[in-house]
Each structure stands twice: as C-alpha cells, then as structure tokens.
Regions:
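A bilobed periplasmic-binding-protein/Venus flytrap-type ligand-binding module shared by bacterial periplasmic
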Residues: 120-130, 225-239
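Short helix-initiation/N-cap motifs at beta->coil->alpha
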Residues: 44-47, 68-80, 173-184
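Bacterial lipoprotein signal-peptidase II cleavage site
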Residues: 19-31
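A conserved helix-loop-strand patch within extracytoplasmic ligand-binding domains
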Residues: 106-153
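Pocket-flanking alpha-helical
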Residues: 53, 73-107, 183-184, 204-210
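Short, well-ordered beta-strand elements
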Residues: 32-48, 65-70, 144-148, 246
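Ligand-binding cleft/hinge of the Venus flytrap
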Residues: 55-63, 141-173, 278
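Short beta-strand->loop
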Residues: 108-116, 194-203, 207-222
C-alpha cells in the first residue's frame, strides 16, 4: 500500500511540473502585452486626432503592446510628452497652429516628422452664405456676430482671436469643443441659418456639408500645414520597435477622412480604426518595416 501511495505522489508531482513548465505556452494576451511593454498616447479630442490616435493604438496593440490613450488640452499634451508622461502624440499641427508650444517645450520633444501632409485651418461657413472673405465680416452682422470655436488654448482659437483683432471684427468667439462646434454647424445648416465656425481639414464635416473657407488676405491662419508625430526624448532607446512604427506612420487626408466619417456616422472610434487597419493592410505593413 505504501509503495502505491509513493507512486501516486510521484505521478502528481510530475503532472504539476509539466503543468508549470507548459504555462508560457498558455500565456494570456494581457501577460504578453505586459512583457512587450505599455505605451501611452496623448491626444486632443479633435476628430482628426481621435482618428489617428486610435489607428496607431490598434497597430501597436496588434504587435502585442498594452496601449493607453489620454485626452488632454493642447497645452498639457505638449507638456506631457516633454516631461515623459506620454510616449507619443500624433497631434502636432506645425509650423503655425502649435508653433508656440514647440517654442516652449521643444527641448523635450523628438519630432518624428509629418504623419499627414496638407492641412489647413481658418474660418468656415456654409457655402450658401454670401461672403467670401474674413474682411466681409466687418461689413455686416453675420451669424449673430458670433464665431463658434472649440476648446480654449487650441492654436486655432489663438489665431481666431488674432483675426478678430487684426480685421477689426466686433464678433464674439465662443469656446466649446470639436463636438459642440460640429453640433452647432449641423443645427444651423439644418435650418438654413448662418453660422461661422473655426474649421480645419481634414475633417469629416467637409464630406457631410457644403462648406467653404473664408479667404484670409492678412494670412493670420498661415499657409498649409502638416500634422507631426512627436515622441518623448528617450523613446527610441527604450522602445525601438514602437519608435520605428511611429516614425513610419503616415497616411493621407482621404485615409483619415474615412475613419472620421465612420465615427461621425455612429461607429465607435476604435472599431472604425480597426476596420480601416483591416482594409488597408498594405499601408499598415509599410509602417512595420
């Protein structure tokens, strides 16, 4: 009987050893992501940045990284990357819109270059409005002498405050958010009412409504810009694969618009990003080289 008990004990020990030895093969996705490391992406809650940040998040997660997204103001975004609170951001509008933040925090930022070329900012109105230039706003009381803006501190808000001063406009700039601006635009167009909003491309509203930029003869809003990817200093050494993917990340305004339109039509941001990644594997594979 004792021999039988000893044999059973040895068999149990053997089974436990085998089970423990096989554990890495059954590693959970969470454990794998923990081994790869965690990445924190900072962004501002503008539709364009929601699209790009979610796409980069999906690509990095597919490589096995644990990715967090943090929504902050533009000022805190640059400060966060410079101080190492965020690893990356895809939301740097340069050289004009966010130029002041680069001047302030540039020493702590690693500029990986443009991820999207050919952006524009300015004042936008429905095409049915009988004005074509910011100068025209001074000749009448359009849209109740109100300009619907986004979050305070955004570069486009600073430029609009400058435009009001330089063009001598007696207009009020309303602070809000990207979503609130889009809602105000939709409501006004639905009732054929005048509205003036701070606008930028790429943005899904240009695919959904007939809009136009007001000409800016004084050049307050600058010329065409690019959206850059910024990394914290040291990321290249700490996470070379993440750094390489972020450096290669580049897409077109049409690519971004595809994600933004899907979100505006009710799809979740991450779902829209995953759909785009699935449908554009050739582009994504280029980022992974």
């Amino acid at each position: 009987m004792m021999k039988m008990k000893t044999l059973l004990t040895l068999l149990l020990v053997g089974v436990l050893v085998l089970a423990v030895g096989c554990q890495p093969a059954d590693e959970t996705p969470g454990e794998a992501a923990e081994e790869m490391g965690s990445v924190t992406l900072g962004y501002v809650s503008w539709d364009s940045e929601i699209a790009s940040t979610n796409v980069l998040k999906v690509v990095l997660e597919d490589l096995g990284y644990d990715v967090d997204m943090m929504d902050v103001s533009a000022a805190l975004l640059y400060q966060g990357v410079a101080e190492g609170d965020f690893d990356l951001t895809t939301a740097a509008w340069l050289p004009t819109t966010h130029g002041d933040y680069i001047n302030q925090y540039g020493a702590g930022l690693d500029d990986l270059g443009p991820n999207l070329n050919g952006t524009r900012i300015g004042l936008v109105v429905p095409s049915f409005m009988d004005i074509d230039s910011i100068e025209d706003l001074a000749t009448g009381e359009y849209a109740g002498t109100q300009i619907t803006g986004i979050d305070p501190g955004a570069g486009i808000m600073q430029a609009t405050e400058a435009a009001i001063d330089e063009y001598g406009l007696d207009y009020e700039l309303l602070e809000g958010s990207d979503a609130a601006m889009a809602a105000a635009l939709n409501d006004a167009i639905s009732y054929d009412e005048e509205v003036i909003v701070t606008g930028w491309t790429p943005h899904w509203k240009f695919a959904s409504y007939d809009l136009k930029y007001l000409e800016d003869p004084l050049g307050i809003y600058g010329s065409d810009e690019d959206i850059h990817t910024l990394a914290r200093v040291g990321l290249e050494d700490d996470m070379p694969e993440v750094y390489a993917v972020a450096s290669n990340f580049h897409w077109t305004p049409d690519d971004m618009a595809g994600v933004m339109v899907a979100i505006s039509e009710g799809m979740g941001a991450e779902e829209a990003a995953r759909q785009w990644v699935s449908e554009n594997q050739d582009t994504v594979n280029g980022w992974l080289q």
